[in-house]
Amino acid sequence: MLRAEKISFSVGKKQILKNVSASFLPGEFNMILGPNGSGKSSFLKIFSGEINRFQGTVLYDNKKIKELRKEELAKKRAVMSQQADLGFPLLVEEVVMMGRYPHFTFNPNKKDVTICNEVIERMNLVEFKERNYVTLSGGEKQRVQFARVLAQVWEKPADGYRYLFLDEPLNSLDISYQHEFLQAAVELIKDHTVLIAVMHDINLAAHYADNLFFLKEGEMTVHGRPKDILTENIIEKVFNVKTKVIENPVTGKPLVIYN
């Protein structure tokens, strides 16, 4: 389990997060949504250890994140940020291998190579394997970056859980790859995985998420199962937009229609 207890965070005089608490269970797809500037990405960065100056407590398996060594943290959690660009040319297979860096000292072993090949195949990137990363489109880069973070936590942990943090992972992806991406994530959480993604598309979130967490102005407004919290009143309160929420005739899940 991953827990946040009374998290507050400020940049200068601006308070980004205000006394936010939440729990995230393994085996469930957790998605954070909210308007721009609501603190979603900052919340994710605190969980991943990228931001370490904050008030409150983050617990990995009941162990404080500030007590985890960087090497230990790197082996159990992976982060996919919004920025997919690299400042130097690498082959796609080399970028994916970057996800294995925490697991070896000098050179990758046979297991590292096997894992990268499995991930590349799973993400349908075999034809891109020897392409220069900088020549790829934005959507192709996103897929490679997802393969990289999957490679980092591909192995099932001997004890405890693995953690995957995705910050707006669907940027630049077309519809088919959005679903491929989310389906791969759903498969991953079945094996001792805590998964948290920052999302913008409410209907995709309603389709794939087990739990939704709504942030607004740095505060946790509401959280729960999509069918319980995706109501017209809550959506208007969080996003200041009028909607009609109906049952998807195919999936039975909430479907948000904008007025």
Where do the PLM segments sit?
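ABC ATPase nucleotide-binding domains
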Residues: 232, 237-259
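Conserved ABC transporter NBD signature motif
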Residues: 56-64
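Conserved ABC ATPase signature
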Residues: 132-136, 140
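H-loop (His-switch) and adjacent beta-strand-loop-beta switch element
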Residues: 212-226
